[in-house]
C-alpha cells in the first residue's frame, strides 16, 4: 500500500484535521491525524493493518513471538496487525508515567515487534523498547501506520512505516505567525 492510499483512507474517514494542534510530543502542528476516526471502521483498520503486517513480514527475518502496542494509541493497530501475522498481541500501559507490562508475562529472549499508530518523535516506541528490554525481550523492529517525520525519527531499532507523511511540527516557542493566531487544541492520548 502506498502513502497516497493510506492518506486516502484517512481522508475518507475525515481523519485529516487542520487547525492548531498540540501533539502528544508537545510539538505544535497545523495538521492532526485523528486515527480514532479511522480505527472506528473495522474495514479500514483491517486494510491498513493487513498491509502493515505484509511490510513487517518482508522486513523482519525469523520468527516474531509477539506484537506489542503502547497504550492507548497502539492498542488497535497492534491487535489487528498481530492477527494478520498470526502471533499474540500484548500491550504496555503507563503506570506512574512509565510504560509497564502489567497484564502479561513475556519470556526472556522473546522476539517482539512494537506496533504504533502514528509516530512523530518516536518517544512512545523508545519508552516501550526500554520497558521490554528490561524484561529481557528482544525488540527486532517497530512499525507504524504513519511516520509523520518521513523517516527522520530514529527509535533504536528498524522503523517500518506503512506511510511516510511529513507534516510540519514546531516547538511552542517557534510557531509561525499564522499558526500562533489560531487557538491550540490538544487531541492526543499520552496522559490517558
Swiss-Prot record:
The residues that hold orotate are: 120, 148
Query: Which keywords does this chain's UniProt record carry?
Result: Glycosyltransferase, Magnesium, Pyrimidine biosynthesis, Transferase
Repeat is among the record's keywords: no
**Sites where the protein binds 5-phospho-alpha-D-ribose 1-diphosphate:** 116-124
Enzyme group, top EC level?
A: transferase
* Record-listed E.C. numbers: 2.4.2.10
**Catalyzed reactions per annotation:** orotidine 5'-phosphate + diphosphate = orotate + 5-phospho-alpha-D-ribose 1-diphosphate
HAMAP family in alphabetical order: PyrE
Query: What does this gene product do?
Result: Catalyzes the transfer of a ribosyl phosphate group from 5-phosphoribose 1-diphosphate to orotate, leading to the formation of orotidine monophosphate (OMP).
Give the family this protein belongs to, as stated in its UniProt record: Belongs to the purine/pyrimidine phosphoribosyltransferase family. PyrE subfamily.
Name assigned to this protein: Orotate phosphoribosyltransferase 2
Q: What is the lineage of its organism?
A: Bacteria, Pseudomonadati, Pseudomonadota, Alphaproteobacteria, Hyphomicrobiales
Gene coding for it: pyrE2
